[in-house]
Regions:
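Bacterial signal peptide processing site
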Residues: 8-10
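Glycine-rich, aromatic-bearing surface loops/beta-hairpins
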Residues: 14-25
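C-terminal motif of bacterial Sec signal peptides marking the signal peptidase cleavage site
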Residues: 3-6
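Surface-exposed flexible segments
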Residues: 39-52, 97-109
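Terminal, regulation- and interaction-focused segments at domain boundaries
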Residues: 23-44
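Short, catalytically relevant binding-site loops at active-site mouths
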Residues: 35-37, 70, 126
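Helix-rich interaction surfaces within compact, conserved domain-sized segments
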Residues: 79-128
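Mature extracytoplasmic domains of secretory-pathway proteins
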Residues: 46-84, 89-95
């Protein structure tokens, strides 16, 4: 039994703690719904325009976009489903990145009449 004690898998948190300072970054994933409360779904060209005009200038070092399908339990007790886009950003944990991310959330909500843009943050260790 004592031999097995050394076989535990370290947690993700421990991995970040042992990451070299130069490799410590933040991963933020934003989830953008594509349905409007009224009217047509947000089109591919509208999404591309948002990425090209709003996201890329703020995160020039790179980004990743995934097609997604979201669902949640509405206040009415019914499951709502919606096509979505997930935008993954790897960035420094700094005030400018924070400002840029919040700007993107605000722009998208305003431009496309969205109630929210979900945000998930986690520390990561990045190597190229």
């Amino acid at each position: 039994l004592l031999l097995l004690a050394g076989c535990t898998v370290p947690s993700q948190h421990a991995t970040v703690e042992t990451c070299k300072a130069d490799n410590q970054m933040q991963q933020t994933t934003l989830y953008f719904g594509l349905n409007r409360p009224a009217g047509a779904q947000i089109s591919g060209s509208e999404w591309k325009g948002f990425v090209d005009q709003d996201v890329t200038p703020r995160f020039r070092d790179g980004l990743t976009v995934f097609d997604a399908r979201g669902q949640w339990l509405g206040n009415d007790g019914k499951v709502a489903r919606e096509p979505s886009k997930a935008l993954m950003l790897i960035h420094g944990k700094d005030a400018q990145s924070e400002k840029n991310i919040e700007a993107l959330r605000g722009i998208y909500k305003s431009r496309f009449a969205q109630e929210s843009v979900m945000r998930v943050d986690q520390p990561v260790c990045v190597q190229f």
